[in-house]
């Protein structure tokens, strides 16, 4: 009997690689990242753990590479878990961020993430089951703390997840958004900073992060902030957001504007 498959973007290192290791006991893997050699090494490791892996070497800032992953998501009925994890960050001052960096960041964190989320959503809706995990960031709800462009891209992914929740849920699809804080991965080095400059009590190890995110999924959380002590804070924030809903569109301005 064929095992279900999990497709993971950004699978060659950090969060994606750790998810692959954690899921290998239950899923075969489709591993997506730019670095084919790293993916081959990971696939060999996972094979020893009993999981077969398919490799898709792809730079997801390129539209044609995103299209290849879209086709895989929509054509392989064994795929039932999608980790939307590929992303880049920048620590430059927002106003000094280069056009090249902006375009690459938006292409990966927004355009590719959206296209793949929707492809998975279409595929899983047709099959009436499946799980999408969108890897956002804590700066999605606290954008003042980091580069505004990066924070904006992660806020977009959170909003996309929230907007899709009802449509997906009624078709048997689970969508979870994970909002990590600072996590010890290569994204910091690639962004041009040293994570050791951050207070150690602010930095989570990647294995702990992934364990918490998977536990949150098991608990039925649709938004998971691994470092947040009280989940009621998320529920309260969501309730406050939804409280605005009845008055967001009216035929006249509020009384204070008259």
Give the positions of each predicted feature.
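Conserved glycine-rich cofactor-binding loop
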Residues: 10-13
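Conserved glycine-rich Rossmann-like NAD(P)H-binding loop of the short-chain dehydrogenase/reductase
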Residues: 26-41
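The beta1-alpha1 cofactor-binding region of Rossmann-like NAD(H)/NADP(H)-dependent oxidoreductases
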Residues: 36-37, 57-68, 99
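Substrate-binding pocket helix/loop in short-chain dehydrogenase/reductase
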Residues: 93-104
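Active-site helix of classical SDR
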Residues: 117, 153
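Residue(s) in the substrate-gating loop at a strand-loop-helix junction
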Residues: 137
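C-terminal helical subdomain
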Residues: 177, 193-233
């Amino acid at each position: 009997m064929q095992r279900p498959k999990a497709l993971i973007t950004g699978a060659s290192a950090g969060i994606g690689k750790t998810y692959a290791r954690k899921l290998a006991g239950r899923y075969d893997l489709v591993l997506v990242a730019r670095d084919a050699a790293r993916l081959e090494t990971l696939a060999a490791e996972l094979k020893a753990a009993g999981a077969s892996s398919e490799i898709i070497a792809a730079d997801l800032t390129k539209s044609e590479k995103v299209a290849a992953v879209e086709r895989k998501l929509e054509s392989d009925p064994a795929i039932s878990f999608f980790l939307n994890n590929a992303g880049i960050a920048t620590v430059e001052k927002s106003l000094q961020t280069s056009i090249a960096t902006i375009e690459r960041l938006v292409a990966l964190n927004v355009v590719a993430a959206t296209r793949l989320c929707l492809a998975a959503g279409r595929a899983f809706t047709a099959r009436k089951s499946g799980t999408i995990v969108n890897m956002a960031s804590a700066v999605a709800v606290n954008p003042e703390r980091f580069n505004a462009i990066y924070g904006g891209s992660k806020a977009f992914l959170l909003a996309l997840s929230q907007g899709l929740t009802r449509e997906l849920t009624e078709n048997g699809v689970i969508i979870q958004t994970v909002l990590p804080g600072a996590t010890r991965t290569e994204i910091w080095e690639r962004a041009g900073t040293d994570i050791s400059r951050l207070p150690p009590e602010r930095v989570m190890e990647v294995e702990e992060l992934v364990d918490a995110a998977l536990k949150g999924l098991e608990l039925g959380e649709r938004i998971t902030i691994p470092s947040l002590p009280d989940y009621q804070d998320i529920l309260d924030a969501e309730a406050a957001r939804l409280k605005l809903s009845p008055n967001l569109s009216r035929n006249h301005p509020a009384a204070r504007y008259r």
